[in-house]
Amino acid sequence: MSNGVEQAVSDIVGAAGGNVFLLRFHGYGTSGVAGISDGHGLGDGIDHRSSIDSSNIHQLLPVLRRLASIFGPYGNIQFMHCSTGRGASGQRLLQQIADGVGVPVTAALRDQLGGGANTFKFEGPTFTAFPGGNNLRSWCSSRPDFPGFTPA
Protein backbone atom coordinates (compact mmCIF):
# COMPACT_ATOMS: atom_id res chain seq x y z
CA MET A 1 0.00 0.00 0.00
CA SER A 2 1.47 3.34 -1.00
CA ASN A 3 1.81 5.79 1.89
CA GLY A 4 1.15 2.88 4.25
CA VAL A 5 3.32 4.29 7.06
CA GLU A 6 1.11 7.40 7.18
CA GLN A 7 -2.04 5.26 7.12
CA ALA A 8 -0.78 2.96 9.89
CA VAL A 9 0.22 5.89 12.11
CA SER A 10 -3.13 7.62 11.53
CA ASP A 11 -5.03 4.45 12.40
CA ILE A 12 -2.95 3.86 15.54
CA VAL A 13 -3.21 7.45 16.79
CA GLY A 14 -6.95 7.43 16.12
CA ALA A 15 -7.54 4.21 18.04
CA ALA A 16 -5.04 4.34 20.90
CA GLY A 17 -5.36 6.19 24.16
CA GLY A 18 -2.51 7.99 25.85
CA ASN A 19 -1.16 5.14 27.92
CA VAL A 20 0.16 2.55 25.44
CA PHE A 21 2.93 0.40 26.88
CA LEU A 22 3.94 -1.59 23.78
CA LEU A 23 3.47 -0.85 20.09
CA ARG A 24 4.59 -3.80 18.01
CA PHE A 25 4.97 -3.83 14.22
CA HIS A 26 5.20 -7.09 12.24
CA GLY A 27 6.44 -7.23 8.66
CA TYR A 28 9.34 -7.85 6.32
CA GLY A 29 12.69 -6.33 7.17
CA THR A 30 16.41 -6.31 6.71
CA SER A 31 19.25 -4.29 8.21
CA GLY A 32 17.92 -0.76 8.68
CA VAL A 33 14.56 -1.47 7.01
CA ALA A 34 11.13 -2.11 8.54
CA GLY A 35 8.30 -2.85 6.14
CA ILE A 36 4.96 -1.54 7.40
CA SER A 37 2.56 -2.05 4.49
CA ASP A 38 4.70 -3.50 1.74
CA GLY A 39 4.98 -7.00 0.41
CA HIS A 40 8.11 -9.02 -0.09
CA GLY A 41 10.21 -8.28 -3.16
CA LEU A 42 8.45 -5.23 -4.63
CA GLY A 43 11.85 -3.96 -5.77
CA ASP A 44 10.59 -1.42 -8.32
CA GLY A 45 12.97 1.29 -7.08
CA ILE A 46 10.15 3.64 -6.10
CA ASP A 47 9.72 4.85 -2.52
CA HIS A 48 6.08 4.06 -1.84
CA ARG A 49 6.47 5.18 1.80
CA SER A 50 5.34 1.70 2.77
CA SER A 51 8.49 0.96 4.76
CA ILE A 52 10.78 2.90 7.07
CA ASP A 53 14.45 2.98 6.08
CA SER A 54 17.49 5.23 5.86
CA SER A 55 16.44 6.64 2.48
CA ASN A 56 13.11 7.99 3.74
CA ILE A 57 13.46 8.36 7.52
CA HIS A 58 13.81 12.15 7.29
CA GLN A 59 10.52 12.41 5.38
CA LEU A 60 8.77 9.95 7.70
CA LEU A 61 10.00 11.28 11.08
CA PRO A 62 7.27 13.96 11.22
CA VAL A 63 4.72 11.18 10.65
CA LEU A 64 6.30 8.88 13.25
CA ARG A 65 6.54 11.71 15.82
CA ARG A 66 2.74 11.71 15.97
CA LEU A 67 2.99 8.36 17.77
CA ALA A 68 4.52 10.11 20.81
CA SER A 69 1.04 11.12 21.99
CA ILE A 70 -0.16 7.53 22.46
CA PHE A 71 2.52 6.34 24.89
CA GLY A 72 2.46 6.23 28.66
CA PRO A 73 5.64 6.87 30.65
CA TYR A 74 7.06 3.40 29.95
CA GLY A 75 5.96 3.11 26.32
CA ASN A 76 8.15 1.39 23.75
CA ILE A 77 8.16 0.23 20.13
CA GLN A 78 9.20 -3.17 18.78
CA PHE A 79 9.84 -4.02 15.15
CA MET A 80 9.30 -7.79 14.85
CA HIS A 81 10.93 -7.85 11.42
CA CYS A 82 13.93 -9.86 10.24
CA SER A 83 17.25 -8.17 11.05
CA THR A 84 15.98 -4.57 11.22
CA GLY A 85 18.34 -3.75 14.11
CA ARG A 86 21.42 -5.38 12.56
CA GLY A 87 24.54 -3.37 11.79
CA ALA A 88 25.25 0.33 11.79
CA SER A 89 22.32 1.13 9.49
CA GLY A 90 19.89 -0.75 11.74
CA GLN A 91 21.15 0.87 14.92
CA ARG A 92 21.12 4.32 13.33
CA LEU A 93 17.52 3.87 12.11
CA LEU A 94 16.32 2.71 15.54
CA GLN A 95 18.11 5.64 17.23
CA GLN A 96 16.45 8.14 14.88
CA ILE A 97 13.03 6.68 15.65
CA ALA A 98 13.71 6.57 19.43
CA ASP A 99 14.83 10.20 19.40
CA GLY A 100 11.89 11.26 17.24
CA VAL A 101 9.13 9.45 19.13
CA GLY A 102 10.72 9.68 22.59
CA VAL A 103 10.47 5.99 23.53
CA PRO A 104 12.87 3.03 23.36
CA VAL A 105 12.82 1.13 20.07
CA THR A 106 13.84 -2.53 19.79
CA ALA A 107 14.45 -4.73 16.74
CA ALA A 108 15.95 -8.12 15.95
CA LEU A 109 19.49 -8.69 14.78
CA ARG A 110 18.65 -11.97 13.03
CA ASP A 111 15.89 -13.48 10.92
CA GLN A 112 12.53 -13.89 12.66
CA LEU A 113 10.83 -17.03 11.40
CA GLY A 114 7.61 -16.52 13.35
CA GLY A 115 4.74 -18.94 13.43
CA GLY A 116 2.92 -20.18 16.51
CA ALA A 117 4.04 -18.62 19.78
CA ASN A 118 7.29 -17.42 18.14
CA THR A 119 5.28 -14.73 16.37
CA PHE A 120 4.96 -12.90 19.70
CA LYS A 121 8.59 -12.90 20.84
CA PHE A 122 11.99 -12.11 19.41
CA GLU A 123 13.98 -15.08 18.16
CA GLY A 124 17.56 -14.34 19.20
CA PRO A 125 19.44 -11.15 20.07
CA THR A 126 18.02 -7.66 19.73
CA PHE A 127 19.22 -4.06 19.74
CA THR A 128 17.39 -1.34 21.67
CA ALA A 129 17.89 2.37 21.06
CA PHE A 130 16.93 4.75 23.86
CA PRO A 131 15.90 8.40 23.40
CA GLY A 132 18.88 10.71 23.60
CA GLY A 133 21.30 7.81 23.20
CA ASN A 134 20.79 6.85 26.84
CA ASN A 135 21.01 3.32 28.22
CA LEU A 136 18.37 1.26 30.02
CA ARG A 137 19.46 2.39 33.49
CA SER A 138 19.40 6.11 32.73
CA TRP A 139 16.13 5.90 30.81
CA CYS A 140 14.39 3.93 33.60
CA SER A 141 15.67 6.30 36.27
CA SER A 142 14.09 9.19 34.36
CA ARG A 143 10.64 7.52 34.49
CA PRO A 144 8.11 7.90 37.32
CA ASP A 145 7.63 5.03 39.76
CA PHE A 146 4.81 2.62 39.02
CA PRO A 147 1.87 3.50 41.30
CA GLY A 148 1.92 1.35 44.42
CA PHE A 149 5.52 0.23 43.87
CA THR A 150 8.81 1.57 45.14
CA PRO A 151 12.25 0.69 43.81
CA ALA A 152 14.09 -1.95 45.83
Q: Residue ranges of each PLM-predicted region?
A:
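Glycine-rich short-loop/terminal segments
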Residues: 1-51, 150-152
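Caspase-like cysteine protease fold
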Residues: 107-152
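Generic detector of well-ordered alpha-helical segments enriched in charged/polar residues
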Residues: 6-10, 61, 65-68, 137
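Catalytic cores of nucleophile-dependent amide-cleaving enzymes
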Residues: 26, 33-116
